[in-house]
Amino acid sequence: MKENFNISKLKNGLTILTYNMPYVHSVAINLIAKVGARYENEEEEGISHFLEHMAFKGTKTRTAQQIAEEFDSIGGYFNAYTGYENTVYYVRVLSENCHKALNILADIIQNSIFADEEISKEYQIIMQEIAHHHDNPDDLIYETFYNTVYKDQPLGKSILGTAKTLVKFTQEHFLNFIGKHYNAENLYLSIAGNIEHNKIVIIAEELFASLKQGVTSSFIPAKYIGGKGFIHKELEQTSLVLGFECTSYINLEKLYQTYLLSIIFGGGVSSRLFQSIREKLGLAYVVGSYNSAYFDSGVFTIYASTAHEKLELLYSEIKNEIIKITETVSTEELMRAKIQLRSNLQMAQEQNSYKSEEIGKNYSVFGKYILPEEIIEIITNIKADDIINTANKIFSGTTALAIIGPNDLNGF
């Protein structure tokens, strides 16, 4: 409900967003920095993610252990994650501990010291994360896919960075990156739960007073390229990711048409890919489709794994299903997909962790809060012809293909 949503801007420009949910006992806090991996230059690759790791490693007044103990002492859950377009720090605590949680979070964002010994330790941890990532075929194939689709662009680089760049980062690098991107205009504090907006504003005015004004960060526009990427790896199965360019998240009508297409095509056990590739032909245990959207680009992906000798047949059957969905979509299929999408959206509204992230990301991207009712209306108005037209536009575009397996795939 719109009346539960409030927004204020502090004197320094920090945006405060709250959504009151009086029936819950907790609050979910998100501090969203509008900076991620695609904002990095070549020398900075991986610094957004590294910085997120360093956020809980000590401030001017708290050691890493004290930060952990203070969060535990208020029964809080805290973590952070880095994407291509933002970095999110989130906390969930009982409403009575909201002030204390904000105090710690504000200290982390404004006063982290990035001690050399902590940088060295975290470097080793991230290198282990990268090694784990490269040992996982699913992670590796998607990394290869994005390297191919957005070749030589920040959106095609790994969020984790590389040993070549990570090993060079010092306290100075982190402080410079913070100074450049972690300013009041580039941060959004969003809170959902049993809270009062005016009290949150007063608390935030006090705790985030030292944030400098600054400007919103910018990035180089993405250019979808397509192409093929192959990785030779001794595995029990061969996996493929087939992709096409699709809409960004700025056009909501096109975005939700693409979501519905993905659900119908490969989004669940009743989807066409699942029923054809797995249930009817037995070609794959895992098969599905998904669309990823960014500010100025998007990718529709189809993923499957199969026995090495069945790869060509699998690929052929996927292409057959692509042809079919560009021709017909039934009323029943569309209705099932709409119910799935609406159900997921409406059930998520009951979770304050979802609401906190939703209002923060909405405002950081669109400059406004998009009501769930607006989204539901968009979904409701989509017709079968819209899905067919979307499928034709997407699948007539330049193909991108990534394959990982033990065989020689260069002739594929």
From Swiss-Prot:
PROSITE patterns: INSULINASE
A Pfam family it matches: Peptidase_M16
Originating organism: Rickettsia typhi (strain ATCC VR-144 / Wilmington)
Family matches, as InterPro entries: Metalloenz_LuxS/M16, MPP/UQCRC_Complex, Pept_M16_N, Pept_M16_Zn_BS, Peptidase_M16_C
EC numbers, comma separated: 3.4.24.-
Binding site residues for Zn(2+): 49, 53, 129
Cofactors (names): Zn(2+)
Name this protein carries in UniProt: Uncharacterized zinc protease RT0210
Highest taxon listed in the record's lineage: Bacteria
